[in-house]
Amino acid sequence: ATYKVTLVTPSGTQTIDCPDDTYVLDAAEEAGLDLPYSCRAGSCSSCAGKVTAGTVDQEDQSFLDDDQIEAGFVLTCVAYPKGDVTIETHKEEDIA
């Protein structure tokens, strides 16, 4: 399945198509969006965003704790969409 992923970035909002077996960061790059990242392995917070609608599968991540995940934080480099989802990007500095 392919879902609509809406990315709310500092430079505007864009909606991209993202297959359920493709990481959000990869799909964004394929669509020509320039999102922050570093390790691409789910073990840092450079690519962090915040889910404001919908859900993602980020089981491959190893950086966020349960409280951060409950608050909606997501590592876009290891996040698969589980449906249509809205993510605010560039949220690394908001992670407490």
Curated annotation (Swiss-Prot):
Disulphide connectivity of cysteines: none
Protein family: Belongs to the 2Fe2S plant-type ferredoxin family.
Alphabetized UniProt keyword annotations: 2Fe-2S, Chloroplast, Electron transport, Iron, Iron-sulfur, Metal-binding, Plastid, Transport
Cofactor(s) needed: [2Fe-2S] cluster
Gene3D superfamilies: 3.10.20.30
Identification of the protein by name: Ferredoxin-1
Entry-linked InterPro entries: 2Fe-2S_ferredoxin-like_sf, 2Fe-2S_ferredoxin-type, 2Fe2S_fd_BS, Beta-grasp_dom_sf, Fd_pln
Organism: Phytolacca acinosa (Indian pokeweed)
Cofactor stoichiometry and binding remark: Binds 1 [2Fe-2S] cluster.
